[in-house]
């Protein structure tokens, strides 16, 4: 079966470098400040900022809690972050692009679906569960980034 793709985007009212810095910082920014409550038990295992960061987490969706571990890469530093779940075939890409109002941020997830009836159910449910989760995350990102800009603070130490 072809992979399942879910993509949500919105304009964030902050400069791209600030927003990218928040997303790349798993110690103080990304997970601490913007993740919806469906994510829990977030633990940075290695790194913490940018490529090489490894994070463990729990995600509760559709009444099920899944534990996972993901590794962060930066295929295009300053523009694209890529989270790859280490057990499974799930990748989530965070794309930050300049826009007149600040920047446009897109969260895109691609995951492999199961074969047969389970795959059909996954194809129906994954977008319905992930899209609202990502919309909430992007709204939280917008609020947090706007607060940082208003306070004239960098996204995190070492990231401009």
What are these regions (language model features)?
Residues 82-136, 152:
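Beta-strand/loop substructures that line and gate deep hydrophobic ligand-binding cavities in soluble
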Residues 8-10, 59, 68-74, 91-98, ...:
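Hydrophobic/aromatic beta-strand elements that line small-molecule binding cavities or substrate pockets
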Residues 1-49, 160:
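Hydrophobic ligand-binding cavity/cleft-lining segments
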Residues 22, 75, 132:
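Conserved catalytic core of Hanks-type protein kinase domains
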Residues 12-14, 61-63, 76, 111-115:
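Beta-strand elements of well-folded, non-transmembrane domains
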Residues 18-20, 31, 65-67, 93-94, ...:
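Short acidic, gly/pro-rich beta-turn/loop elements at beta-sheet edges
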Residues 28, 41-88, 104, 136-160:
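Glycine-rich portal/gate segments that line the openings of hydrophobic small-molecule binding cavities
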């Amino acid at each position: 079966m072809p992979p399942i793709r879910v993509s949500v985007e919105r304009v964030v009212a902050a400069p791209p470098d600030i927003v990218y810095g928040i997303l790349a910082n798993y110690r103080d920014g990304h997970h601490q400040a913007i993740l919806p409550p469906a994510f829990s038990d977030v633990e940075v295992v290695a790194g913490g900022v940018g490529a090489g960061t490894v994070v463990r987490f729990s995600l509760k969706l559709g009444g099920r809690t899944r534990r996972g571990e993901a590794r962060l890469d930066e295929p295009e530093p300053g523009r694209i972050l890529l989270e790859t779940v280490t057990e499974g075939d799930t990748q989530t890409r965070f794309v930050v692009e300049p826009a007149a109002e600040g920047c446009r941020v897109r969260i895109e997830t691609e995951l492999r679906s199961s074969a047969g009836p389970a795959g059909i159910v996954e194809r129906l449910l994954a977008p319905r569960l992930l899209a609202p989760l990502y919309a909430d995350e992007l709204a939280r990102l917008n609020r947090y980034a706007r607060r940082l800009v208003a306070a004239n603070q960098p996204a995190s130490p070492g990231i401009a």
